[in-house]
């Protein structure tokens, strides 16, 4: 019989919880009950109610609806939230309306369902003779809370936290080395079975450092580098770029000198062979033939060996100088047949048949 009743009631309970969650989370409305002392309702952070001037009414139990006692405004000058007192008894009903009176948000449940406890305070850390650490703090004024203690070595990363949890406000963390330094932090978490799924844990306390047997200076031996001391990236990049450019220029000049030293200078053929490219378009055979045709004829070896005779000067006996020039064979006197030869003063004349003398 009990199983049948559970099967019938379970879907209804789940549907009611889903409906309540849907009403509570509808739009951009957030409800938080801070340490069961005040209830904070905020809206307008999203697109549904951004810029809208909304009004809130509330009541506990079946009393009359009351207006919000204290609004806070956004930067645009419109309402964005309300602070109202929390009561541990009775159901809290919230009604949020727009300027025309239309309902935009409504919820009715205990204020503790939106509980967010305050962080633990006056946290004390003590080493035990066994090498463990006892963490203690004052208890909250209400029940239904679990506490979490996280620890890590001082130089570990953010994700290196190890958790120890329990229902009391006095927890012992074991497995530690007294010669090392550790960081601790604590928070309180409402139990879902006691307050519901919309309750949320408190903020973490500030990190407390425990040095143990080590000196306090050893805990801060290797602090994280300050961002202000980091070298500026832009000047460093510009300096590296300038250095790289200068190195490339020097390498190019040195490479050119090495190339000039290793490779001989090749003369320009257009200066040594005029007309080779202008007239013959690089045809060396045609250029040679043209150069031979325009060159003066060279002397043969026979002409170089030929000796030309020179005329001699003949000194006659009477002291007069006579220049004897050889005559060509066509001008040598030939005596015609039948002529008489006459010699006068050493000169010979030939007398022809007509009586004239021929010298």
UniProtKB/Swiss-Prot annotation:
A motif (Box 1 motif) lies at residues 262-270. One of its GO terms (biological process) is inflammatory response. Residues 20-232 are extracellular. InterPro entries: CRLF2-like_D2 (IPR048648), FN3_dom (IPR003961), FN3_sf (IPR036116), Ig-like_fold (IPR013783), TSLPR_D1 (IPR053856). Residues 254-359 are cytoplasmic. Residues 119-213 form the Fibronectin type-III domain. It holds the Pfam family TSLPR_D1. The chain crosses the membrane at residues 233-253. A motif (WSXWS motif) lies at residues 201-205. One of its GO terms (cellular component) is external side of plasma membrane. Keywords: Cell membrane, Disulfide bond, Glycoprotein, Membrane, Receptor, Secreted, Signal, Transmembrane, Transmembrane helix. Glycans are attached at residues 53, 122. Induction: Up-regulated in the myeloid 32D cell line by granulocyte colony-stimulating factor (G-CSF). Receptor for thymic stromal lymphopoietin (TSLP). Forms a functional complex with TSLP and IL7R which is capable of stimulating cell proliferation through activation of STAT3 and STAT5. Also activates JAK2. Implicated in the development of the hematopoietic system. The WSXWS motif appears to be necessary for proper protein folding and thereby efficient intracellular transport and cell-surface receptor binding. The TSLP receptor is a heterodimer of CRLF2 and IL7R. Binding of TSLP to CRLF2/TSLPR is a mechanistic prerequisite for recruitment of IL7R to the high-affinity ternary complex. This is Cytokine receptor-like factor 2.
């Amino acid at each position: 019989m009990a199983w049948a009743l559970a099967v019938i009631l379970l879907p209804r309970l789940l549907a009611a919880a889903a409906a309540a969650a849907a009403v509570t989370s509808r739009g951009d409305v957030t409800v938080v009950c801070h340490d069961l002392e005040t209830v904070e309702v905020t809206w307008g952070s999203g697109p549904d109610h951004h810029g809208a001037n909304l009004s809130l009414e509330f009541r506990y139990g079946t009393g009359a609806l009351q207006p919000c006692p204290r609004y806070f405004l956004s930067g645009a000058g419109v309402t964005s939230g309300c602070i109202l007192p929390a009561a541990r008894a009775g159901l809290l009903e919230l009604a949020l309306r727009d300027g025309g009176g239309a309902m935009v948000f409504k919820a009715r449940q205990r204020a503790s369902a939106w509980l967010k406890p305050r962080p633990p305070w006056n946290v004390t850390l003590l080493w035990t003779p066994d090498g463990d650490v006892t963490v203690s703090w004052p208890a909250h004024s209400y029940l239904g809370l679990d506490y979490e203690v996280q620890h890590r070595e001082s130089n570990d990363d953010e994700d290196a936290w190890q958790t120890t949890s329990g229902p009391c406000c006095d927890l012992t963390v074991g497995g530690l080395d007294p010669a090392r330094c550790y960081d601790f932090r604590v928070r309180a978490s409402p139990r879902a079975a006691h307050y519901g799924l919309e309750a949320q844990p408190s903020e973490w306390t500030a990190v407390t450092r425990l040095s143990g047997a080590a000196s306090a200076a050893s805990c801060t031996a290797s602090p994280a580098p300050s961002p202000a001391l980091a070298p500026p990236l832009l000047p460093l990049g510009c300096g590296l770029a300038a250095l790289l450019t200068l190195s490339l220029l020097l390498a190019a000049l040195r490479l050119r000198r090495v190339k000039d030293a290793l490779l001989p200078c090749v003369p320009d053929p257009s200066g040594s062979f005029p007309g080779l490219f202008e007239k013959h378009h690089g045809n060396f055979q045609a250029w040679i033939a043209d150069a031979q045709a325009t060159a003066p004829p060279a002397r043969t070896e026979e002409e170089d060996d030929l000796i030309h005779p020179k005329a001699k000067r003949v000194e006659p006996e009477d002291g007069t100088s006579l220049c004897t020039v050889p005559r060509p064979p066509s001008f040598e006197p030939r005596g015609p047949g039948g002529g008489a030869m006459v010699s006068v003063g050493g000169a010979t004349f030939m007398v022809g048949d007509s009586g004239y003398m021929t010298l």
